[in-house]
Regions:
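ATP-binding pocket architecture of kinase catalytic cores
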Residues: 26-149
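Conserved catalytic motifs of the protein kinase core domain
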Residues: 45, 92, 193-195, 214
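Short beta-strand segments
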Residues: 51-52, 83-84, 138, 197-200, ...
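Active-site Asp-x-Gly
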Residues: 195-197, 203-262
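Active-site activation/catalytic loop segments of kinase-like enzymes and analogous catalytic loops
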Residues: 231-258, 271-288, 295-301
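Alpha-helical scaffolds flanking conserved acidic
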Residues: 262-270
Length: 307
């Protein structure tokens, strides 16, 4: 495996020096992992954020984020302002953006109106028409790597069948529930799905607040996808929410209870399938406690609202 390039404050300084003639007033690294690094800087009156990855494939994701953010902003969704995406200055993918004002929604207790706002923004995002399904869509000029149909996406990209096999192999679902899932997954390719833009991870951790009870930005568009809305969006967005928060989100989205009921089973199926790779990792790590929690969760033991 090729050794990854080292990312330091000097790496970030080189990017800022190329695009801004004014001297940096401050430069600090906010956080960094094995492959993703985030820096904050002040240049004149500008407060900026620089994201750098030492994985070359990340350039595609940065380009996708840039397209998705602009498309969503055109629908009046509050988003970060991405100024530049490239890999020519430091031979690594980077993204320069203006710093978002506000605080993370996870930093304080919030009311139901924030969830209504999230739902309304989700509806606006999902109103952006796109072509094809998955990670490669309108932002890219590529043609050979596209999934042109929902059926192709499920088989070749999402790999729904393999996810079911993972659940079966590790005996996560009770036999009767596994049987129901297999029947539902066989029906998925035949459902009428039209692609639109999805944020892909519209949860509280990706929401910034302005301190006045309003959302100032929807952030972290790495998982943006051209997919079937609202089913795909809801499968993740509703995952962490309590019943009151779910109802507020759906109210903000503008979907009536009867309409939601029609798609609720599909949302459940997608949600369960999302666990496939996570379960495989837990099994590989021999994390029996995690597998027991998944078994409890996915068989409905934690659902206090239905029989």
């Amino acid at each position: 495996m090729k050794k990854l390039e080292k990312v330091t404050p000097e790496t970030a300084r080189a990017v800022f020096a190329h695009y801004f003639s004014k001297k940096l007033q401050k430069l600090q690294q906010l956080h960094g992992g094995a492959t993703n690094f985030v820096f904050e800087a002040s240049v004149g009156k500008e407060d900026l954020i620089l994201r750098i990855s030492n994985r070359p494939t990340k350039l595609q994701y940065f380009m996708k984020e840039q397209w998705a953010v602009r498309a969503a902003h055109a629908k009046n969704v509050p988003t970060p302002e991405i100024l530049e995406v490239g890999n020519d200055i430091i031979a690594m993918p980077y993204m320069v953006m203006r710093r978002v004002e506000g605080e993370p929604a996870t930093a304080r207790s919030i009311g139901l109106d924030i969830y209504r706002q999230m739902g309304a923004h989700a509806a606006a995002i999902n109103s952006v028409a796109t072509s094809d399904f998955g990670h490669i869509f309108d932002w890219s000029r590529n043609r050979l790597s596209r999934s042109h149909s929902w059926k192709d996406y499920l088989a070749d990209n999402f790999k729904a069948t393999e996810r079911v096999q993972a659940l079966a192999r590790h005996k996560i679902l009770r036999p009767e529930n596994l049987k129901k899932l297999k029947v539902a997954v066989r029906k998925l390719p035949g459902l009428k799905a039209q692609p639109t833009l999805n944020h892909g991870d519209l949860r509280l951790k990706n929401v910034m607040l302005d301190g006045k009870g309003k959302i100032s930005a929807i952030i972290d568009w790495e998982h943006a996808t051209s997919n079937w809305a609202p089913c795909w969006e809801f499968a993740i967005a509703l995952h962490d929410l309590g019943i009151d928060e779910k109802e507020a989100f759906l109210d903000g989205y503008g979907i009536a209870p009867k309409e939601f009921e029609k798609i609720s089973n599909t949302i459940k199926v997608l949600n369960i399938l999302h666990y496939g790779p996570i379960i495989e990792k837990a099994a590989k790590d021999k994390d029996r406690a995690a597998l027991a929690r998944f078994e409890q969760r996915l068989n409905g033991a934690l659902d206090p609202f239905s029989l």
